[in-house]
């Protein structure tokens, strides 16, 4: 990735041009630039799959830009029919981070897993952008939330988010801690954006009639579920690809956004934005997200000033 001046994108039929106020960095951005995502825009392209932007008539909206003109830019185009009003209680960076991660969390926990008040929810990567959204949504639903993280700094973040129990997978036995905390029952719902070893551990500590919601493979390994194990333990494995709802049931996406806006207005959810970076730092932000070293959300803000160059740099 490199920063270049290019012409402003021209809206196609049914599209509008938006001025980008903030663009959230998502794991799909890392996959896009590696050529590993299910969508492969023609080169050259600009990544950035969700933004908070401003319409030409001054409305503040949330949108998914039309690739190849992604959100790490000053202007994008997006389908007019899919624009959502940005909540007034959130700033631009927070609004940009409310969409995909929180919609995924809401559909995963409520539509797919049918999370109930009083149930125990286990969230992997609880200090990350996707995981922190699931933690907040789980608490808002009245669940007891167990957050799994990697490292002390991320453990502190998960505690601040309100997790009832935080497990540092680098220093603790995840399965044993879950069994101990739940008096041997296990977690009713597991929210897994990681895959690999996280999924393997989930299958060992999911409750009778529990539900494992698979939302991604940020760990880099796609697990192979043992269906005989699911059979003898009576648990469900649920897949979630939020983009299908946007394509097949846009009314459900709008209803979810209305609910998320209400939760934000009541202070029950608020995207955890850890950094706001200028366009010049977008490539570094994507790399750090891919490396798994971040907490919360990194958001690209085109109007943010670039960091001063070190002595001799850029000359």
Task: Give a label for each model feature.
Residues 49, 61-127:
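NAD(P)H dinucleotide-binding glycine-rich loop of Rossmann-like/cofactor-binding domains
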Residues 149, 197-268, 301-315:
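Glycine-rich phosphate-binding loop and adjacent beta-alpha segment
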Residues 98-172:
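Mid-domain Rossmann-like dinucleotide-binding core that forms the NAD(H)/NADP(H) cofactor-binding site
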Residues 173-184:
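Short amphipathic alpha-helix with an adjacent loop that forms part of the alpha/beta core around
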